[in-house]
Swiss-Prot record:
It is found in: Mitochondrion. Belongs to the AIM18/AIM46 family. The lineage of its organism: Eukaryota, Fungi, Dikarya, Ascomycota, Saccharomycotina. Keywords: Mitochondrion, Transit peptide. This is Altered inheritance of mitochondria protein 18, mitochondrial. One of its GO terms (molecular function) is intramolecular lyase activity. SUPFAM superfamilies: Chalcone isomerase (SSF54626). Coiled coil: none annotated.
Amino acid sequence: MDRGRCANMLKSLQRTLAKCQKSPSTKHWQCFKRNFTSIRATKYPGRSNSTFHYWPWFAASTLLATSLYYRDRPVQNDDKTDAFPSHTESIQVDSSVSDFPLTITALNFPVSTTFKLLGYGQRHVTFLRFKVYALGLYLAENDENLVSDTLNETYLHKYFLDVDDSKTPKENLARLLKRDDSKSVMMIDDLLDSGMRMLAKITPVRNTDFKHLKEGLVKTISKHPDVANNKDTLAKGLSELNDAFSRKGSVRKNDDLIIELLANGALQFSYHDSKNNEFEVMGVVNNQLVGKFLFSQYLCGEKSPSPQAKKTAIDKLITLL
């Protein structure tokens, strides 16, 4: 076989491998194996007529080794968000932005404590179905015990009548968190009232501006089911949010908005310019309803801005019960 045909076969193999890396379906891997078997059997005369050089076999072997590396690599794609790789330091939330760290500390972000990733997903604009930002929800490492301290057997029997006695308290609590929107709101709100510290990392997947980010936060907060009972207090809180979020201008794709829920219920906003790796603390909202309603919406209810992030976060919370 001549060099040109061998080169074309290798290019075909590379294209198939690229598809495998992007979408590791059974069909793509079967195609890769067929191409690999074909090219492995190929040989052609090298520069010396006295011997044969099996360079296609070696090249294909190299590609195969590379493919196995990527196939086994714990990279998370946009549609599979049900696992937290234990042996990596970050996870892919959306392929168009940088991976999200599994741990956020004061060494790399302007935060008050160490946070561990709780859940993650994307925010879509409903009527157009395009992605707006990647979202990571984090729980303070030292506050993990508050989950089981708050949502325990005593809590279950005190506030809920529809307890299935054939199931364990943990199974009953998990069922309420996952399947009953109204009760999950109550449970999450009680968790937040316990002083549980959280953090949200918002990373735009397209260029935007601070105005749009602020408007998105206000809309999310305003969808909490208890807004009607707290109009006056919340109005003051949203005024604080407007002052804390006074920065204007553009926010580039892959920059970060960091929202930290402090132990006293206040919210601290920080901005990360990823291109220059610069941080700015934008402001603080002391009104406790703003932070409570925002993170409650992230974690529960019918109108969460990212159902994907809500699901992964609730699944992780259940493991802490």
